Amino acid sequence: MVKKIIAAIFMAMACSCSHLDLKGMFMPTGEGVEKRFEQSKEMNEDLKNGYVQTQESYAFYVATDPHIDETHKNLGTFNDAFRNDKGASFGVILGDCIDVKDNLPVYLEALSYSPEKHTCDHKIFHVLGNHDLFFNGWVNFKELVGPSVYWFEAIFDGGKDLYISLDTATGSLGRTQTKWLNSFLQENRSGYRHCVILTHTNFFYTDNSQASSGNMPMEESMALMDLFARHNVALVLQGHDHYREDLTFGKVRYTILGAIHDSAAAPEYLKVNVSSDGLHLDWQLI
C-alpha cells in the first residue's frame, strides 16, 4: 500500500496540474452524495428528466468512460453511429466523461448533433462518474449537464419503460438517495413495462480500485440487488472498471461495459434493442 501511494505521488508530480487532481486521488472533492442528491432535487423536484417518444420496439445506445482529454475519436465514432440510426431513440453515457479540468464543454461538443453529418437529433442522457468530480467538477456538471439523480420515460402507444440514473460517483448511494429509490420503485414500478438502472460504479467488483471513489460496499450492493429483484428490474448498466462483464443475479441482468476512451485496449459501445420480448444486447467494437 505504501509503495502504491509513493508511486501515485510520483505520477502526480510528473503530470500537468490540469490532468491530475492530486487531492481527488486520495479523498472526494466537492459536495458529497447527500448534497448532490439534494441539489438534484432542487433542479427537478420530482427528479423527472423528461421523456422520449418512441415505438413499442426501439433501440438505445450506451457507452462509458470516455475520459476526454486531448482526443475523442472513439466517442465521435459512437456519436456518428448513434445519430445515424433511425431505429434508435436516445443515448446514454455512463460517466467518467472527462479527465482534464474544465473539459466538459469539449465532451458535450463531441456528442453534439451536426445536420451535415447526422440524420437524427437524438437526446443523450449522462451519468455522473468519479472522474467527473475531480477538480470540484460537480459545479460544472450540474450547470452544463444537470442532475446526477433522475428518471425518464420511453413512451410508446399502449405503454412506457422506466429508466433511472443513480449517483454512485463516490462509491455509495448514501442514505437519502437509497430511501428515495426504495420508495420510488415501490410506488411507481408497476406502471411500466421494463425498468432499466443506469449507474457508473458497478456492484460486483469489490476491490478499492478507483482511489477516493472506491467500489460499492458489498452490503449495499446486496441490498440493492435484492431491491432490483423484488421490483423486476430488467437491466442494470454499469461502467467504472474498464472491462466487460455480463451476468444475471436474482433474474436481473447486470452488464458492465468496457471503456470507450481513445487509449482503451478494446474500446466498445452497446446497442440495446428493446421490445415486449425483452432487451437484446448488441456489442459494437471500435
Feature roles, as predicted:
Residues N188-N208:
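Short acidic, glycine-rich surface-loop motifs adjacent to enzyme active sites
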Residues D65, G95-D96, G129-N130, H200, ...:
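Active-site glycine-centered loops adjacent to acidic/histidine catalytic or metal-binding residues
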Residues M27-K48, V52, N103-H194, G214, ...:
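Extended active-site neighborhood of metal-dependent phosphoesterases/phosphodiesterases
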Residues H19-P105:
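N-terminal active-site segment of His-dependent metallophosphoesterases
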Residues V2-A8:
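Sec-dependent signal peptide recognition
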Residues C15-S16:
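C-terminal motif of bacterial Sec signal peptides marking the signal peptidase cleavage site
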